[in-house]
Amino acid sequence: MYCQMSVSLQPKIYKNEFFKMQMKTRRIAHLMTLLAISTTISAQNVATDSVAQPAKKSKLTLGGYGEAAFSRNFYSDNQYRYPRKDAHKNAPSNGRFDIPHAVIYLGYDFGKGWSMGTEVEFEHTGTGSAIEIATDEDGEYEHEIEKGGEVELEQFWIQKTFRPWANLRIGNLIVPVGLNNSHDEPLEFFTVCRPEGENTILPNIWHDTGFSLWGEVKNWKYEVQMIAGLNALQFSRNKWAHNAAGSAFEFKPANKYGFVLRLDNYSIDGLRLGLSGYYGLAMHNTYPNEMEEKDKINDKVRGNVFIGSIDFTYEKYNWIVRGQADYGTLSDASVISNIKANTPKESPFDKTAVGKAATAIGIEAGYDVFSQIAKMKADNQKLYIFGRYDFYDSYIHDKSQSNNDYTRVRKITFGLNYLPIPQVVLKANFAERLFLGKYNNEPSINIGIAYQGFFL
């Protein structure tokens, strides 16, 4: 396994649009990086997706996190290994080096309750493209992809704080549905790669443009958001809503809106309980919006999306235990599947069928064995031995749809997390996907190192 879901091919990327988007995102990323390096750090915590609490107050905040990973997968990496399982049963192992995420966070407190926050994320070391002149094709200009990956402006918002219980935030926001989207930094999960279940069926990290009202009251924290809705044509069999928050265009269509609610409670010492949900219409939320016109055959197709999630974190007595359960539904799934299958070949939309529902359940527990060794404990070093269990299904189909057992996955993981200092972790784990159908299991070994924190 590598730090990206391997049960499906990557979405299609069309050349002209790809290079336009990549060149623009590179300019944004380079500008943000130079700006971040030239600034001083602060201590104000102005991000929902923060990596740590800064040490002292000042107007500027600079922080981030990053991960490097090695994976060895003892199964086929062929894209047809599920439908043609017998042909790939004895395939050789394969390995990968990767930089799954490298993030720079920059925030500023303008005063009088006004602040801003930005977060730029480089995935898989970023991306690169170039133009070359071919010497053997009459001097033809050629576009070359020199590096696969992504650069994303994951957060950009401006906030007005009225009271601790009333903060208004407008811009590109983290959507805190599920455990991983609200706690995605590498010190907030034990595995080398982000937990697989939620990362399969939900956008991750889910971020979108809209409005947020949030605050804290005693032992409660709440957040309410109105954002651009998901796109039904980007739901898929292997990843359900994972790609549905994205856009292949230079803007995000927002013909329909989504509504988000998250509540967290801290009443019990060492325990955080979270409840989150999303509701919105997903059909007719693309460009151009032609199928919603009066008297057209698909005008009344709505694609209602509901996602509910419950999660918790318990940290006490040298234990850390985390868990989550998610369930999502999509109305008109079979009709939407037919619409997707008949979109133009050149369109950027997935053509696979989409299920009426998807689910993900995960739990992990780790114990700090260095807590029993006085010297290590005094030096603030930690060594967690952990185990994790996941179950997820990205394609719960209705009676009119075909069955695909390989989307129902159980996964077990065992490993170690060593923290020589609080901001750095070395990770190692063994994992195996166990399929409920007659498919080949998928064992893997992963080793990684990560940091998370503010720089001053």
Question: Language-model features: where?
Answer:
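Cleavable N-terminal export/targeting peptides
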Residues: 1-53, 456
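Outer-membrane beta-barrel biogenesis signature
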Residues: 43-94, 179, 196, 373-383, ...
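Outer membrane beta-barrel
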Residues: 57-74, 92-232, 255-260, 264-272, ...
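Outer-membrane beta-barrel pore domains
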Residues: 75-77, 88-91, 134, 141-146, ...
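A solvent-exposed, charged loop/short amphipathic helix patch at secondary-structure junctions
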Residues: 82-89, 240-245, 342-345
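Solvent-exposed loop/turn segments connecting transmembrane beta-strands
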Residues: 96, 123-124, 203, 253, ...
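Active-site glycine- and acidic-residue-rich loops that bind
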Residues: 204, 250-257, 300-304
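Loop-centered beta-sheet repeat module
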Residues: 234, 240-288
